[in-house]
Amino acid sequence: MKNTTSSLRRVRLPRTPADWLEAVMNFIFFLCGMLAVCCVVLISVYMVVSGVPAIHKIGIFKFLFGTKWASTAAEPLFGILPFILSSIYGTLGATILGVPIGLLTAVFLSKAADPKLRTVVVTAIELLSGIPSVVFGLLGMQVLVPAVAKAFGKASGACLLSAIVVLSIMILPSIVSVSVTALNAVPPEYEQGSLALGATDTETWFKISIPAAKSGIAAGVVLGIGRAIGEAMAVMMVAGNSPNMPDSPFRSVTFLTTAIAKEMSYAGGLQRQALFSIALVLFVFIMLINVVLNVVLKGGNRDE
């Protein structure tokens, strides 16, 4: 009885206008948080409900591991393995190409750049992050695709390699900005101690600063991967959009995102359901990337 009475005393109704305002704002914050949760739940449920029927009709093995996609044929085939591998190879290639450039740029901006030059480079990177995807695709289609065809003697430069180059440029802002923030957060005592022991600036940056900021740098890399695997418009303009297996960097390919974008406007019946199933697979990929990001961040916090 005493516990109940004390609990009631702790729950006080607002009395002053400031208390009422605080209560109302807390309720609004709660509603906003619940709205975000509801959006995620509704999207997840919708993707599952829309994507599972086609997988059930086609067969999960034929759908995920089939190598032929002919959705408009008299006897349609719905194998998305070429799309999955193209997305993985394209994202992996963009990561391999973009991460070293982004990391070195971040080290330069954080540790070595002159303040005036740093301002110019940071401004350029911010502008790069604000360029629409269609502009990247347009520039890639007009400049990169002909250059690839000419450089390698191919009939067309619309291929996996062109998509990798465009994606590597698009993920740079995410990697650079997050990595710079992580490097700036490294305690200066770490670097001062290294320099006092006789290490050079370069040795200090690569052996002390980067390892100390590894969780933040990893977060930037994962964000870049998420950007790359979810990109559609720019990739569709430079990759060729043929449902081929990505057995060569010069092969015209289709990513998971571009498969949905190029067919959804006219799809119907099982074809439309199969496109929703592709979206479900892509959704699972994005969720896994977010899980990896959370694990990386939590691991970094424990190390700190």
Task: Explain the meaning of each model-derived region.
Residues 22, 101, 114-119, 187-188, ...:
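Amphipathic cytosolic juxtamembrane alpha-helices at the membrane-cytosol interface
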Residues 180-184, 188, 195, 262-304:
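C-terminal transmembrane helix and the adjacent membrane-cytosol boundary/short C-terminal tail
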Residues 1-32, 293-304:
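Transmembrane alpha-helical segments of polytopic membrane transport and secretion proteins
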